[in-house]
Amino acid sequence: ARGLGDEGITLDAGAETQESDLPAIGKSAAGIITALNYSPYLDTPKNKDFVKRYKAQFGPDAIPSLASMGAYDAMHVIAEMIKATDGKRDGEAAMAAIKGYSWESPRGPVSIDPETREITQNIYIREVKPVEGGLMGNVPIFTYENVVEPWHAMQKK
């Protein structure tokens, strides 16, 4: 991405500007706007606590990514399924337990559609800006709330 700005080229991306890649891109990433379902810079108590615990586990310079957030939420749902089945191996009961399930994730409110099992979640418009420690980060600038997976939403019409 170095030099693209000098050539008047705007890089439109999604996960390509994740925090783990931004140190290599550097300040030339400033102003890139992306849409994604997570940013470690979400200003919510749940996310701040998640980031704090993540850094405690993986080091003070570690920054949660979309992948680590996905793993966190997946384990949350698996734990709910285990609770619902009292630890028994019962796939039908486990799936029934999460039909229509909703929770407050560090990425915001998430719910599972009881029919399609697709999730509804917020999508954040993020802009790469300077953040603490001289780093660049994807800072949320707008939120689309409760976004339904587009394919299934179109099929319901």
PLM regions: where:
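Extracytosolic ligand-binding ectodomains
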Residues: A1-K157
